[in-house]
Amino acid sequence: MIKSELVQKIAEANPHLYQRDVENIVNAILDQIVDALAQGDRVELRGFGAFSVKQREARTGRNPRTGKQVDVSSKVVPYFKTGKEMRERLNGAA
């Protein structure tokens, strides 16, 4: 499912909302999550999961095309850990 499909499903489930309003809300939520992560904060949505960032250390990698070793610098990467309720629903317990 892509973002536009998510917006459409939410709009269909809530006929009192305009699709463009739903799109604005979804975009605002995602922007706030990204902004919080950019500041190094953790974003927890109880039952759904938690977004955080982790520091990936610098390492020596390999170019798969040439086989040549390359230095890969350290970077911050997003991380998502699923919540208990989501895991239970996905595994049919709920």
UniProtKB/Swiss-Prot annotation:
InterPro entries: Hist_DNA-bd, Histone-like_DNA-bd_CS, IHF-like_DNA-bd_dom_sf, IHF_beta. Keywords: DNA recombination, DNA-binding, Transcription, Transcription regulation, Translation regulation. One of its GO terms (molecular function) is structural constituent of chromatin. Coiled coil: none annotated. SMART domains: BHL. It comes from the Bacteria. SUPFAM superfamilies: IHF-like DNA-binding proteins. GO terms for cellular component: chromosome; cytosol. GO terms for biological process: DNA recombination; regulation of DNA-templated transcription; regulation of translation. Belongs to the bacterial histone-like protein family. This protein is one of the two subunits of integration host factor, a specific DNA-binding protein that functions in genetic recombination as well as in transcriptional and translational control. Heterodimer of an alpha and a beta chain. PANTHER family: DNA-BINDING PROTEIN HU, INTEGRATION HOST FACTOR SUBUNIT BETA. HAMAP family: IHF_beta. This is Integration host factor subunit beta. It comes from Azorhizobium caulinodans (strain ATCC 43989 / DSM 5975 / JCM 20966 / LMG 6465 / NBRC 14845 / NCIMB 13405 / ORS 571). The lineage of its organism: Bacteria, Pseudomonadati, Pseudomonadota, Alphaproteobacteria, Hyphomicrobiales.
